Amino acid sequence: MIKREDVYKIGLFNKPHGIHGELSFTFTDDIFDRADCDYLICRLDDIFVPFFIEEYRFRSDSTALVKLEGVDTAERARMFTNVEVYFPVKHAEEAGPGELSWDFFVGFRVEDVRHGALGKVTDVDTSTVNTLFVVDRDGDELLIPAQEELIAGIDQKHKIITVDLPEGLLSLDECDDEES
């Protein structure tokens, strides 16, 4: 059985394309094209199910048409409408740290070299120029800049990001809490 911690979300199947079972796929990470893995994982009724890729072709930087094995009709393809698509972490790790998308780091623990454990990454905010790790710290949301110069190390095996935050950055969050 595939567990949630063994995969990470890379996109969504939108709707069937044509009559031969192709699916329109919107993705946030093209790891399926860069890593040596011939299947995608779909979340169906809260169960992670692998499907082998028969073929795919890109339509843009964030969309592709995907043909899955055994999905040969538009009717069968409709069953995948709005289905979340995941990729196995073990195959993504083979791609190397420089080739990973930000979504890969959701679920990683964050530790600071001086302050110790900070929490777990629940999301990555890429809506601005400065990408931020959204970290759950005992129920509070902590925003940590995802900048290379602040990251002291990444342990993919144990899912830990070690950061070296500047003095005062963590206390800024505490000041915001006091003003509220």
Swiss-Prot record:
GO biological process, any: rRNA processing
GO terms of molecular function = ribosome binding
Localization of this protein: Cytoplasm
This protein's major location comes to: cytoplasm
Tell me, what's a Pfam family for it? PRC_RimM
Entry function: An accessory protein needed during the final step in the assembly of 30S ribosomal subunit, possibly for assembly of the head region. Essential for efficient processing of 16S rRNA. May be needed both before and after RbfA during the maturation of 16S rRNA. It has affinity for free ribosomal 30S subunits but not for 70S ribosomes.
Q: Belongs to which family?
A: Belongs to the RimM family.
The text the record gives for the protein's domains is: The PRC barrel domain binds ribosomal protein uS19.
**Record-given protein name:** Ribosome maturation factor RimM
Organism expressing this protein natively: Bacteroides fragilis (strain ATCC 25285 / DSM 2151 / CCUG 4856 / JCM 11019 / LMG 10263 / NCTC 9343 / Onslow / VPI 2553 / EN-2)
